[in-house]
A protein has these predicted regions:
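Well-ordered alpha/beta subsegment
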Residues: 156-160, 165-166
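Heme-based O2/NO sensor domains and their adjacent alpha-helical segments
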Residues: 45-155
Length: 175
């Protein structure tokens, strides 16, 4: 594949790599789906009123969700630290996350997965991904030589941090 074909393939996969599957989820009410759709299209976390509205509909604890969102940057920073400690070779010259632009893309992806997790937690919907979007992400990662083991470690770290938060804060189901 030449560079023009490669760029076209990457561009097509980026367009397909929409991972949020909550926009049409039948167990989420229409108002909550609309709020999630808007936030997802704008690639942002939920705002306070959106959190409160979605949590009221789903019966989840808006304070726990708001706290998790307020800590998002810290969680991504801890993922960076974990990955840099456990897989330092990825950041060295010749590593899959070198130069800095490549590692910054990894952190953006972590933030986006965390963003999706916040929507899922607020709506109390664990099945939150779009299968075709996830498949496109996998293809994109393969095409761009994203280190799968590194991304897996980063996402596992994120999951552990959020799980720890949920166990140490009031239950997300408490109102």
């Amino acid at each position: 594949m030449n560079s023009t074909e490669s760029r076209a393939a990457i561009k097509a996969l980026i367009a397909k790599a929409q991972i949020c599957g909550l926009h049409h989820h039948p167990e989420i009410n229409e108002q909550s789906r609309d709020l999630i759709r808007t936030a997802d299209q704008e690639k942002r976390m939920l705002h306070k009123r959106e959190i409160e509205s979605i949590c009221t509909q789903s019966g989840t604890n808006h304070e726990a969700i708001a706290f998790m969102i307020s800590e998002a940057a810290n969680y991504v920073d801890r993922c960076k630290q974990t990955l840099q400690t456990r897989q330092a070779h990825l950041f060295e010259e010749g590593g899959a996350l070198h130069p800095t632009e490549r590692s910054e893309a990894c952190w953006r992806d972590c933030w986006n997965f965390l963003r999706l997790a916040s929507y899922a937690m607020a709506s109390d919907t664990p099945e939150c991904t779009d299968a075709s979007g996830i498949q496109a992400v996998r293809q994109l990662y393969a095409l761009m030589n994203v280190p799968a083991a590194g991304m897996t470690l980063a996402l596992q770290t994120l999951s552990q941090l959020v799980t720890c938060l949920l166990y140490t804060s009031p239950s997300p189901r408490d109102s």
